[in-house]
Design a protein with these regions (language model features):
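Trp/Phe/Arg-rich N-terminal binding region typifying the photolyase-homology
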Residues: 1-176, 180
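Glycine/tryptophan-enriched, flexible segments
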Residues: 154-231
């Protein structure tokens, strides 16, 4: 994994608890640099890995349709992680409050999260970093060229930005390693999400129902992509 894909956003001494990946933007078990980085770091220190997703009561006008689609996909993530000996936890509330509480309660050793340019995620991250006293890493698991290395300044337009991306592609185009079955089990608690109860915590528009013509989950997403590339 390219070292420029990761940055340390809080420097502290690591604790002895599990390494925690706060999954947010990149909701998948496969081809996820943030998850792979967390596992590599955990293997280095012989520690367990846990993945936590914080379900917020409302998000930028999302309705039952969007939340239902997302949660069905996360069910698939939970199952895939269990096969790799990694516990998945679904917690509810605002990340700025709930993530630090989880970190303290379970003596988390270090925190890893995926990068998002949205202001709301940056505000959550800032609040969390201020409250925790463990190392915190941010990994760009979304872009081929990490956002913070793409350009040192605000670009005028695509015509000035595109050449920089093209020059950086050979450096960052690399194959994903396979997520391994994690060798260290977290014996304290096994994650088991209560999906129905979590849905009841949402403060969203319930009048927009889920659709049945589009299937959620990373497996179907990969199948759709392969079909598109083939045809």
């Amino acid at each position: 994994m390219h070292e420029k894909r990761t940055r340390l956003i809080k420097k502290c001494n690591m604790k002895s608890g599990p390494l925690m990946y706060w999954m947010s933007r990149d909701q998948r078990a496969k081809d996820n640099w943030a998850l792979l980085f967390t596992q590599d770091l955990a293997v280095k220190y012989n520690l367990p890995v846990i993945v936590v997703f914080c379900l917020v009561p409302q998000f930028l006008g999302a309705t039952t349709r969007q939340y239902s689609f997302m949660l069905e996909g996360l069910k698939e993530v939970e199952k895939a992680l269990a096969e790799k000996n990694i516990s998945f936890f679904l917690i509810t509330g605002l990340p700025g409050k709930k993530i630090p509480e989880f970190v303290e309660k379970h003596t988390v050793g270090a925190l890893v999260t995926d990068f998002s340019p949205l202001r709301i995620k940056r505000e959550w991250k800032k609040e969390i970093v201020q409250k925790i006293d463990i190392p915190c890493y941010e990994v760009d698991a979304h872009n081929i060229v990490p956002c913070w290395t793409a350009s040192p300044k605000q670009e005028y337009g695509a015509y000035t930005f595109r050449p920089k991306i093209h020059r950086a592609l050979p450096e960052f185009l690399e194959n994903y390693p396979t997520l391994k079955k994690h060798p260290v089990t977290w014996k304290e608690k096994k994650g088991k999400a209560d999906w129905k109860k979590s849905m009841l915590t949402l403060e969203i528009d319930q009048t927009v129902p889920p659709v049945d013509w589009l299937k959620p989950g990373e497996k179907f997403a990969q199948k759709t992509l392969r079909t598109f590339l083939k045809n």
